């Protein structure tokens, strides 16, 4: 049975992920931390970290393995939350120490401990993140990681090729461009309560619910996908609205207000109907739903309503919308109910895959290459062996 984790509201916020997102609400089954990466997933169950899916870069934390369809136990300290990137995984212990494992090609593990070659730089067991920092939340992008310290200061590490670390100081040379191999402070005097990261951008919420983003697709009136920003820039909220939660996808970001209204901006999954398919400012998600949380990854987004039903929107290339039809030209521009009738307490987004913690205390996944599952699926598939 899936059981509990929740050291605080803000700590539980980090559990979702990509990849992973620190602003989702804590699950109804406290204690189950869940994160989805590129083609792998991890969960904390009763203080034990278990991972499954692709492990070719050490992201399962048990060495290098092509794939493990059955969850395996990671030799990690007791963790209370998880996030995951394309090929790396990170978690926090109860004291706020951060540990990461998997690919370190671009410094996304943030460690000074010895690493291996898989054959590229990686860590097949958890490594302590450098800097003697204590974090309340983490968020993972594709090849970078960010965290908020106990006082709300933002730090990031990993790839910085388009400003996703929020600093001009990350100028080390990594596989895919400039980077920082250890945590560096984001160039801002603001403090934050939540953070979310994607491929080339990162966003955070301050205590008032205002969104600040850096990197790519910032949600301002400028064409930010042409001119990336290397410092946080406030996202323009229509009508002065503030968000209670925010989640970054591949080229878009979505947020939900305290009243349950969802807004998105960027390219692809903005959920505004047939048009527009992109917006440089936040636009309301159509369909008339009141969401308690939203989750974005890749080209899609999903939201949960009060009864735990999941609705998704965007392209359905691999079944990530959770319904038929599936295909490279199929897209759902309005929130569409995920099939199967499951009710979820929380979701974890990752690339073209979604997993969720159900109200029946199971984990189910749908979309591309279901971690530990049969392949692509447009219907949620329960993960066995948890």
Regions flagged by a language model, labelled:
Residues 73-76, 129-131, 186-188, 237-239, ...:
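Surface loop/turn motifs at the tips and blade-to-blade linkers of beta-strand repeat domains
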Residues 53-70, 101-125, 158-182, 212-237, ...:
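Short glycine/serine- and acidic-residue-enriched loop/turn motifs that recur at repeat junctions
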Residues 1-10:
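Bacterial N-terminal signal peptides that target proteins for export
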Residues 36-38, 45-46, 84-86, 94, ...:
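Residue-level detector of Asp-centered blade-edge/turn motifs that repeat once per structural unit
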Residues 36, 40-43, 51, 88-91, ...:
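Conserved core positions of repeat-based scaffolds
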Residues 14-32:
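Bacterial Sec-dependent N-terminal signal peptides
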Residues 44-45, 55, 93, 149, ...:
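Acidic surface patches and DE-rich sequence motifs
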Residues 30, 37-38, 67, 78, ...:
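Beta-rich catalytic cores
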């Amino acid at each position: 049975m899936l059981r509990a984790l929740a050291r605080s509201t803000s700590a539980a916020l980090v559990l979702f992920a990509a990849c992973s997102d620190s602003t989702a609400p804590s699950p109804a089954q406290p204690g189950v931390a869940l994160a989805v990466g590129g083609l792998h997933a991890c969960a904390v169950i009763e203080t034990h970290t278990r991972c499954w899916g692709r492990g070719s870069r050490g992201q399962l934390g048990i060495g290098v393995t092509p794939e493990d369809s059955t969850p395996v136990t990671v030799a990690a300290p007791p963790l209370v939350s998880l996030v995951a990137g394309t090929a790396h995984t990170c978690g926090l212990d109860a004291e706020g120490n951060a540990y990461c494992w998997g690919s370190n090609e671009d410094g996304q593990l943030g460690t000074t401990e010895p690493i291996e070659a898989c054959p590229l730089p990686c860590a097949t067991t958890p490594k302590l993140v450098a800097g003697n920092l204590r974090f309340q939340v983490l968020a993972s992008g594709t090849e970078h990681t960010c965290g908020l310290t106990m006082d709300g200061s933002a730090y990031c590490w990993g790839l910085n090729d388009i400003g996703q670390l929020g600093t001009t100081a990350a100028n080390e040379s990594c596989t895919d461009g400039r980077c920082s191999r250890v945590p560096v402070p984001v160039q801002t005097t603001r403090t934050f309560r939540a953070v979310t990261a994607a491929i080339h951008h990162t966003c955070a919420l301050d205590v008032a619910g205002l969104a600040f983003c850096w990197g790519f697709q910032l949600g301002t009136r400028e064409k930010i996908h042409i001119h990336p920003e290397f410092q946080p820039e406030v996202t323009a909220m229509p009508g002065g609205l503030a968000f209670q939660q925010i989640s970054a996808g591949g080229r878009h970001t979505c947020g939900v207000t305290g009243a349950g209204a969802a807004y998105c901006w960027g390219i692809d999954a903005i959920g505004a109907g047939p048009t527009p398919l992109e917006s440089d400012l936040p636009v309301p998600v159509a369909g008339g739903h009141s969401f308690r949380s939203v989750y974005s990854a890749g080209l899609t987004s999903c939201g949960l309503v009060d009864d735990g039903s999941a609705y998704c929107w965007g392209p359905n290339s691999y079944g990530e919308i959770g319904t038929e039809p599936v295909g490279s030209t199929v897209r759902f521009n309005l929130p569409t109910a995920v099939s199967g009738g499951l009710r979820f307490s929380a979701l974890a987004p990752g690339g073209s895959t979604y997993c969720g913690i159900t109200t029946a205390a199971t984990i189910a996944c749908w979309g591309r290459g279901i971690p530990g599952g049969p392949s692509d699926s447009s219907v949620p598939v329960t993960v066995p062996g948890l």
